[in-house]
Swiss-Prot record:
Ranges annotated as spanning the membrane: none
Residue spans of biased composition, Low complexity class: 74-84
Lineage, top ranks: Bacteria, Pseudomonadati, Myxococcota, Myxococcia, Myxococcales
Entry annotated with the keyword Zinc: no
Native source species: Anaeromyxobacter dehalogenans (strain 2CP-1 / ATCC BAA-258)
PANTHER family given in the database record: GLUTAMYL-TRNA(GLN) AMIDOTRANSFERASE SUBUNIT C, MITOCHONDRIAL (PTHR15004:SF0)
Gene that this sequence comes from: gatC
Name of the protein in question: Aspartyl/glutamyl-tRNA(Asn/Gln) amidotransferase subunit C
Length: 97
């Protein structure tokens, strides 16, 4: 089932995205393909599969590494290209009243 351009526009509004007409067409195709894949997954018989709370069994968790401080951008470097900033913080439009 293909998503209509109107459905893509509604999703874009909800996600607060501005899409060009070309992007709307591209996303309509991509989202439709994703939904088709999910529909195929829904058809699989998983009655013999034991439910899991994690993708890996408890004994198979990957090894953890120690945290390490690595070189990073300064606050000034990180905000240098921001359209708006206040001191060393990004300034964004208020979306919640």
């Amino acid at each position: 089932m293909a998503l209509s351009l109107e459905e893509v526009r509604r999703i874009a509004v909800l996600a607060r995205l501005r899409l060009s007409e070309e992007e709307e067409r591209t996303f309509a195709g991509q989202l439709s393909a994703i939904l088709d894949h999910v529909r195929q997954l829904e058809e699989l018989d998983v009655t013999a599969v034991e439910p899991m709370t994690h993708a890996l069994a408890a004994g198979e968790l990957p090894a953890r590494r120690e945290d390490a401080v690595l070189p990073s951008l300064t606050p000034e470097e990180a905000t240098a290209a921001a359209p708006a900033r206040e001191g060393t913080a990004f300034k964004v439009p208020r979306i919640i009243e």
